[in-house]
């Protein structure tokens, strides 16, 4: 982290005059720049091209040095469109990697890859900036303690708990509730952990980014009246951006998150949507730079690029960055090098199911497909582990019996199986939960359920204590006491109707 010198500083103007190059070649988003002998910029240095195009329009393009070619030439990748650039234009070596604004001033705002605000809400305080290229924290700084990151969402905390400072893969198609789940997590970390969130939109649709921003304003995650009270900073590099921007926007978001962790000593949630697009952009840049492609046409440096990003996402003794990454699986092929490389870094997976969404069970997290390396008795304790295993066994048995029920009906099942089905249906409904950010749509107030309450509730259902209660009582409630209260209300309503 550094405090920016002003542009009027004589030291800056001398450096800018000193390190001046000229464009020698332009191939799409890739520029070759010639510098005077002995004035070559370093790899990853930012280069800025300023001037006017043939129509007299101002041009301001930032590039990043990727290769030193020899003969005093460098090859750089542009972070924005290169239309209007001409050979012979002046290029200034900034002498540093790209630096972006960090700190409280970023909350409630939308930035591009260069850290420039793109939400028409005026300039951002850029006195405190940080370079996007950094080393991962040293081993001695890491917090190696295994601890659960409580989200307040029952299905996640019980069956696929998140690790504090871990990485979680979020799998789900369109319309199954990814955005709502992301917003609820942003809301809960702010309330329960006093933390903030950073959302990195990497190579996804501009419309989705806009929808997310509007929904965040509607649900109060972004406070329009007082931006400083917002809980999230947004960084977008969407589908229409050049590959250089899409490849680096993840690092911009990560840099903002690192400041909250290292300087403000907070717990941070970092969302990356979509991690596959980060790999895809790297593949495009690799081809443009003339590297020999590897398996399935991906860049030969795929594992290194992924590792460089993922290793910076971790817990230190000061704070933590817990990352939730949406993973697009091309053609549903989990062996494709992009998702396969991502899986190596994940501690947990949260799989959203269209079947559950169709039943109206939200969050539509699939309890059998979602996994976590944290679900071990030595980490979560015997009680939590046993309860989670029993819940999974009950749901698995219900899944196996569904074909028989569809053909022959419930009456043909044994007494034991009928009891299992009844409990499984209660569990399925109890895994649903009203969200704070969905209050606008559901009309029922959101609920944050602590881990101890979650375990107690499921243990009571499994023990058969609530076999007499209707399954409807367990739908969209918080803890188990609310379910019993709802059952009493339902009973009174049915008596009144009679």
UniProtKB/Swiss-Prot annotation:
The modification Phosphothreonine is found at residue 6. The keyword Cell membrane does not apply. It is found in: Plastid, Chloroplast thylakoid membrane. GO terms for biological process: proton motive force-driven mitochondrial ATP synthesis. SUPFAM superfamilies: C-terminal domain of alpha and beta subunits of F1 ATP synthase (SSF47917), N-terminal domain of alpha and beta subunits of F1 ATP synthase (SSF50615), P-loop containing nucleoside triphosphate hydrolases (SSF52540). Gene3D superfamilies: 2.40.10.170, Bovine Mitochondrial F1-atpase, Atp Synthase Beta Chain, Chain D, domain 3 (1.10.1140.10), P-loop containing nucleotide triphosphate hydrolases (3.40.50.300). F-type ATPases have 2 components, CF(1) - the catalytic core - and CF(0) - the membrane proton channel. CF(1) has five subunits: alpha(3), beta(3), gamma(1), delta(1), epsilon(1). CF(0) has four main subunits: a(1), b(1), b'(1) and c(9-12). HAMAP family: ATP_synth_beta_bact. Keywords: ATP synthesis, ATP-binding, CF(1), Chloroplast, Hydrogen ion transport, Ion transport, Membrane, Nucleotide-binding, Phosphoprotein, Plastid, Thylakoid, Translocase, Transport. Belongs to the ATPase alpha/beta chains family. NCBIfam families: atpD (TIGR01039). The modification Phosphoserine is found at residue 13. It catalyses: ATP + H2O + 4 H(+)(in) = ADP + phosphate + 5 H(+)(out). GO terms for molecular function: ATP binding; ATP hydrolysis activity; proton-transporting ATP synthase activity, rotational mechanism. The gene is atpB. Its EC number is 7.1.2.2. This is ATP synthase subunit beta, chloroplastic. It is a peripheral membrane protein. Produces ATP from ADP in the presence of a proton gradient across the membrane. The catalytic sites are hosted primarily by the beta subunits. ATP binds at residues 172-179. GO terms for cellular component: chloroplast thylakoid membrane; mitochondrion; proton-transporting ATP synthase complex. The keyword Magnesium does not apply. CDD domains: ATP-synt_F1_beta_C, ATP-synt_F1_beta_N, F1-ATPase_beta_CD. It comes from Crucihimalaya wallichii.
